[in-house]
Amino acid sequence: MEEINPWSSQPLVDVEKLFTDFGIETIENVLPMIPEVPSFMRRRIVIGHRDYQQIAGCISDKRPFHVLTGFMPSGHPHLGHLMVMKEVVWHVQQGGSGYVAIADREAHAVRGISWEKCDEFGKEYLACLCALGFEGKTYFQSRNNRLKDLAFEAATKVNFSELTAIYGFGADTELAHAESVITQVADILFPQVDSGPAPTVVPVGVDQDPHIRLARGIAHKMRMFTIEEREGYISVRSKNAPEAALNAVKSAFPHAKKYEGHVDIKGGTCTEVAARVREIERAHGGFAFYTPSSTYHIFMPGLTGGKMSSSIPESTISFHESDPVVRKKVMNGITGGRMTLEEQKRLGGEPDRCSLYL
C-alpha cells in the first residue's frame, strides 16, 4: 500500500494509488452537483475528494457548512499555498463559514521553528488570505485553549499503534510530534465545536490525506450514536450515550421502540432522524460531529524538484520576494534540458523533469 508522509518535501505520492488504496474519489463525479464549477476543479487542479457530495449539496441548497484549512508557518508563504487559499475563499463565497488555522504547534514540534518565527510567518499567511478576500475566523493553535481541550478529548479516541500505522511513527518519534497530529485533528473538528455541527470541507494537498483519515475516524468515535437504515425501519444505536439521551430519542419519534442500547424508528427518513438525533446528542453534552469532507489538489512543483516547500526556500517563489530575487531563482531552476547540445538536438528536452514547464 502507498505510504504518505505529510511532512516530506518530495511529491512521491502515486495519485492513482490514492484512489485505489485509500478510497479517494475523483472530483468529476461531483461536478454536476455544483451550480458554478470553479476553474480549479474544471481544470483538474483539484483532482479528488472524500464525501464532497454533502458540501456540494449544501452549496446547491444554500444550507450551512464550514470550510477549514491550516498552514504550517515554517517559512514565508509562497505560490504553492495560493491554490488552497483560493479554495477556502471560494467556499466562503459559496456560503461557507470560513476557518483558517496557523499550525504553529506543528511547525515548532516538527520543524523546530521558534515561536517568534511562527508568529512572524503566521501573520504573513493571514495577510495573504486577507488580500485574496478571505472573510472568516483565524487562530494560532498555541493560543486557542478551546482547541487544546478538543485535542485532549480527541486523543482519548486514538492510540499510538494507530498513529504508527497511519504515519509510520516509531520508538524515536517525539511526543510533541504525535501531539501536533492530534491538534490537527482538533483543527478539522473545531468549526463544529465553535459554530455548531455542520458538514465541513478541508481543502488540502494530496499528501495531507493521513490527517483527514484520522480525523474522520475520530469524529465517528466521538459520536454518542450510530444511525443505521434497516429494512422497514431506522435503528439509532448507542455507542456511549447516557440513558437519558436514549430515552430522549425514543420520545422524539411517535412510532419508536426502545430496546437495550438502541431505539428502532418506523417512519421518517434517515436524514430527518439523523438531524433530530444530533440535536439530542448536543443537548446531552455530545459533539454530534458530521464526518468531515475533503478536497485534494495537485502539488505545485518546486524550482529545485520535489514540491514547492517553505522548508526549502530555494524551491519557492515567495510573495515577499523582489523581482530580481525571483528572476535569479527561476533562471537557476531545474529544467528538462539534456547534458549536451548534441543530446538536446537529437533527443529533445524532458518536459516532465522541468520545474518551469510544469
What are these regions (language model features)?
Residues E116-C118, Q141, V202-G205, T295, ...:
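Conserved phosphate-binding loops in nucleotide/dinucleotide-binding enzymes
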Residues V88, G305, Y357:
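Residue-level signal for inorganic ion chemistry
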Residues H81, M85, Q208-I212, C354:
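Short alpha-helical patches at coil-to-helix transitions and adjacent helical residues
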Residues M1-H66, P73-P191:
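N-terminal Rossmann-like or analogous alpha/beta NTP/dinucleotide-binding catalytic cores
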Residues E116-A288:
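Divalent-metal (Mg2+/Mn2+/Ca2+)-assisted nucleotide/phosphate chemistry catalytic cores
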Residues M1-M72, H220, E228-S315, F319-D323, ...:
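Non-catalytic terminal extensions that flank enzyme cores
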Residues S74, P197-V201, E314:
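Short, solvent-exposed beta-strand edge segments and adjacent coil->beta transition regions
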